[in-house]
Amino acid sequence: MQSDKDKTFDSWLVKAIGRVQGVGYRDACIRYARAQDITGWVRNRVDGSVELMLQGSKEQLADMCRWLRDGIPAAHVEKLEVSKVPPPSPRLNRFDRLPNL
């Protein structure tokens, strides 16, 4: 049986551009997302950016995006590109690291 959390959620694809690789950005994202009950994944891109799939309530995802900009002192995020993923996208079980792309 699905919980209410699984029935009503948004999915956002986010690309963090700037000094976001080699500074612990992905590990920090995983810890923060799991603590906030956000599901999805994070991975490095060959262009030097970090890409994330975020799933949760609009409020959770907006908070995560604010944190992505300023929550990691060693990183310098110049830009966040956010795209909403249209339903139906299946709810992921947890927040994980994917291989680089």
Swiss-Prot record:
Query: Reaction catalysed?
Result: an acyl phosphate + H2O = a carboxylate + phosphate + H(+)
Using the record's annotation, list all stretches that form the Acylphosphatase-like domain: 11-99
GO MF annotation list: acylphosphatase activity
Q: What class of enzyme is it?
A: hydrolase
Record-linked InterPro entries: Acylphosphatase, Acylphosphatase-like_dom, Acylphosphatase-like_dom_sf, Acylphosphatase_CS
Record's keyword terms, sorted = Hydrolase, Plasmid
Protein name, please? Acylphosphatase
Gene from which this protein is expressed: acyP
